[in-house]
């Protein structure tokens, strides 16, 4: 905040403040204990993938100062929005949507019905965020003890402490339908296929690949440190999710 303020003050001194668009965002969040991940981003969950987006654009956001937009968007939608505002052409292959309407009216209903999130670096997961729900489907645990399905009520449980998958199998089924719909609309036409499935076929994330020497070393360490149950599950399921 301190250094941003210095930039803003300099813009004002140079009489550029009213001619400069300010956009603040990020690439990902950091879990602080959620899903037993500390100070890192290892899952396709809400905390990791909900990023800030603060926009001040003279002539666009003037009538909407200090407001919050609750609609759902991808980061890639920002590029499409900037293109629209600046009257730049957008390639037909771009998947982003324009959300300029939300910048002028925070009550706009112009948003995505749901968001699908993929993670293939520290685990192999695909999730879907809709309404107040988050469903996470785990394909490779990345040496953790994630179950196959995790369902969270983000409004009541923002830190993802209570997995409701067993209590709401109808919502799990609906979430998987949305994920399948997204895969059909996006991955079937991808030039190089589904990258998440590529990681799974190769044996899982690099640090937890079942074909690497690290795999057995880690499992042996678990056995030597009173975590034999977890070691047995990893040997049995080869990194795939298992029931607790």
Labelled PLM ranges:
Residues 10-70, 74:
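Histidine-centered active-site microenvironments of extracellular/periplasmic hydrolases
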Residues 13, 105-108, 166:
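Secondary-structure boundary motif
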Residues 8, 12, 82-90, 183:
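Short, hydrophobic alpha-helical segments
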Residues 1-14, 22-23, 79-81, 241-244:
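Extended amphipathic secondary-structure runs
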Residues 164-244:
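Long, internal low-complexity/basic segments
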Residues 28-34, 76-79, 84-154, 159, ...:
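C-terminal cap/loop subdomain of S1 sulfatases and analogous C-terminal strand-loop tails that border
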Residues 40-42, 62-72, 85-91, 160-167:
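Active-site rim elements
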Residues 1-5, 48-49, 73-80, 94-97, ...:
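A structural signal for well-ordered alpha-helical segments within the folded catalytic domains
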């Amino acid at each position: 905040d301190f250094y941003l303020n210095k930039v803003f003050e300099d813009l004002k001194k140079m009489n550029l403040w009213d001619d400069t668009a300010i956009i603040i965002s990020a690439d990902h969040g950091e879990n602080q204990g959620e899903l037993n991940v500390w100070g890192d981003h290892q899952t396709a969950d809400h905390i990791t993938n909900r990023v800030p987006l603060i926009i001040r654009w003279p002539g666009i956001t003037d009538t909407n100062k200090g407001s919050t937009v609750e609609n759902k968007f991808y980061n890639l939608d920002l590029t499409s929005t900037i293109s629209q505002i600046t009257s730049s052409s957008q390639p037909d292959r771009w998947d982003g949507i324009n959300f300029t309407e939300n910048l002028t009216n925070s009550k706009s209903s112009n948003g995505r019905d749901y968001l699908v999130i993929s993670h293939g670096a520290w685990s192999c997961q695909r999730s879907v965020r809709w309404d107040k729900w988050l469903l996470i489907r785990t394909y490779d645990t990345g040496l953790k003890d994630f179950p196959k399905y995790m369902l969270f009520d983000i409004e009541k449980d923002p830190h993802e402490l209570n997995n409701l998958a067993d209590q709401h199998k109808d919502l799990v089924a609906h979430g998987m339908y949305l994920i399948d719909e997204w895969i059909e609309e996006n991955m079937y036409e991808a030039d190089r296929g589904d990258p998440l499935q590529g990681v799974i076929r190769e044996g899982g994330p690099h640090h937890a690949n079942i074909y690497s020497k690290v795999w057995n070393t880690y499992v042996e360490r678990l056995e030597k440190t009173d975590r034999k149950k977890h070691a047995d599950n990893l040997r049995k399921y080869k990194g795939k999710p298992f029931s607790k």
